[in-house]
A protein has these predicted regions:
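Axial heme c-ligation environment in periplasmic c-type cytochrome domains
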Residues: 57-66, 81-109
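Short microdomains enriched in Cys/His and/or Lys/Arg
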Residues: 67-77
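N-terminal export/targeting leaders of redox proteins
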Residues: 1-35, 116
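The canonical Cys-X-X-Cys-His
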Residues: 44-52, 108
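Alpha-helix N-cap/helix-initiation sites
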Residues: 54, 75-76, 102
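Electrostatic cytochrome c docking/interface patches
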Residues: 26-41, 56, 67
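Protein kinase-like catalytic domain
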Residues: 50, 83, 113-116
Length: 116
């Protein structure tokens, strides 16, 4: 095999290995994120008013994600909304303020905004 063939073979091997690693790590990372979010949603009783895909008292998480899609200020807005509560955005029923630590709040908001 000449040097061009060796380079091509090495490139294909490296590319294949990288794709293999991505296919193994991406689903696991998503599952961990879902598991972490579910644990936090339960811990802070978010499911009393919200679900992933249908309105209960407040909007579904997917509705929130769709409303704020493409809005670079959405994470900060949603973090403040959860902390301080508010009304008028999704109807007349107000969202009460919540005592969620910043790190957990960031995890939840990132998870919600990533929903499709």
């Amino acid at each position: 095999m000449n040097s061009t063939g060796k380079i091509r073979t090495a490139t294909l091997a490296i590319g294949g290995a990288a794709l293999g690693l991505l296919s193994l790590t991406s689903p696991a990372a998503a599952a961990t994120s879902d598991a972490a979010a579910t644990q936090l949603l339960t811990k802070y009783n978010c499911q009393a008013c919200h679900t992933v895909d249908k309105k209960v008292v407040g909007p579904s998480y997917k509705e929130v994600a769709a409303k704020y899609a493409g809005d670079s200020t959405a994470p900060a807005k949603l973090e403040q909304k959860v902390k301080n509560g508010g009304s008028g955005v999704w109807g007349q029923i107000p969202m009460p303020p919540n005592s969620v630590p910043d790190a957990d709040l960031k995890t939840l908001v990132e998870w919600i905004l990533a929903l499709k």
